[in-house]
Amino acid sequence: MRARHSILFLLISLGIVVAFVLDIMWGSVSLPASNVIDTLLGHGEHTTTSYVVLNFRLPKALTSLIAGAGISIAGLQMQTLFRNPLADTSILGINSGAGVGVAIYTMAYTLFPSLLSTAGVADTWGIILAACIGALSVLLMISAVSSRLHDIVSVLIVGVMIGFLASSVISILQYFSDEETLKTYLIWSFGSVAGTTWRQLQLMLPVVLVGLFAALLMPKQMNALGLGENYARSVGTNIRLVRRLLIVITSIITGCITAFTGPIAFLGMAVPHFVRLLFRTADHHILVPATILSGSFLLLVCDLLTQAPGHQFVLPINAITSLLGAPVVILVLLGNKRKRDAFK
């Protein structure tokens, strides 16, 4: 089994490298692989290629790499925290909460630009903070509800209702926004990894990496929590502390990524199921790193599918993640009764 897992980890890692290079090559203008590799290695002499790669393609590919890992691990943590195979940052309304935070911040920036741009945070820390606060608020509400309602379906319904409430707040804010602000927010809400700048990456990368590192330190606690509260207590797990840590980690990762990429649906729900099916294990010592790698690989592939080489148009990335993610979840839940029963 260990040999099989090692081979799978190696194959996924190689897939990430290939998808990463292809993601840089493909676009409205196709770039030769040799020129791209030379540029990445610092040996490029092709001015146009170097400019396109370093200023547009490379930030986009890195964003896919980071966001895929972060969104997927957040989904795994949600499924473990709520012991629910359908738990996800989008289904539970956490993405909507982050969206409300960004919408409120954007509206405030429209009304009071001088106040928010004083420290130069108009498109950097302010957006991250607003998205994290929005995501954390919704997650705390869901956590409070789940402690009272032990019915999984009821918790999911509450999450969906919170998502509707968040959408209503966003609609009201959009009504009072000017045309330019409204257009900016709508484009953001479609979800995209293409608009991230190096400055934004400098903020997103360390925040998400800290969250991923924290998740890598918690597989033992996540294993205990996934087997039920009684078992977790019997092995000495501090359930309240673990839950708080999972809530904070998920909120920070989700808020930071959503702030710059917009809400990306189904990835956080589908990737953990895909990894469980592929690795045939429920051990979080395997699931956590496998989910991180698989999430990066799948979002790179989704980004590749959004763009047709030689064409100017780019599909919304949510269209691709939903097309790939929804069937995976449906097939896994329909074909694996044991997986459904494990979360009851």
Each language-model region and where it sits:
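Alpha-helical transmembrane segments in inner-membrane proteins
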Residues: 1-344
